[in-house]
Amino acid sequence: QQSIDLGVDGLTLHPRPDLRHAKPSDISMFDEICLKANKEFNIEGNLFSPSSKDYPGFISLVNDHNPHQVTLVPDADGQITSDHGWKIEQLDSIFKSEVSKFKKNINYVSIFIDDDFSNFDKLNEIGINSVEIYTGPFAEVIKDGKKHEIHSAQNKISKIVESAKLNNLKVNAGHDLNLDNLPYLKECGNIDEVSIGHAIIVDSLKYGFKDTINMYIEQIKE
């Protein structure tokens, strides 16, 4: 709620089957907060995550709530964190069918992609209308600080942003983004949305939560 009050544009939750990031009850709470504030609520997860004792399955979680956006990631159930995007051969007829169902009630159905993805025509065929670029490798390059590698990494992101836009896709980016690498990412073209996660917690220990949120908002929107 404090994030919304301070001016963030939306909230994202990644409810994994092991519940280590979020519980189903958290989704209901976030859903209500975003709905009241007219802010975007994004639910992230693997389309094929099945139900268990305490986890109703990803599809059920989405259908039981009111997200503005769903971001589909190829994470295995026990995977520590998202570390790669979808491969084109994974986007089969079952995937397409579920995307079609989601789009009846959800503004954006997005998929997690690597920075060398190229099959954007396939995404249009499936019905995907948004992508999230996995920026883990990009963040590592910026952290290393080698100018020629930074330039190369920015070119990769710029090309994928341009290709996605040519295919009328909303472009998001996320993973390991922070105050140090966001300025470099902003030079890579018209990215519509970024997701900031762990870095907010880390920076809050130094600057406090309110100042941290304000710093990110200023960095992103300046």
For each feature predicted by the language model, list its residue ranges.
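Conserved N-terminal beta1-alpha1 strand-loop-helix module at the mouth
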Residues: 1-49, 63-65, 122-126, 149-152
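Glycine/small-residue-rich loop that forms an oxyanion/phosphate-binding "nest" at active or ligand-binding sites
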Residues: 31-91
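Histidine/lysine/aspartate-rich catalytic loop segments that bind and position anionic ligands
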Residues: 110-156, 160-163
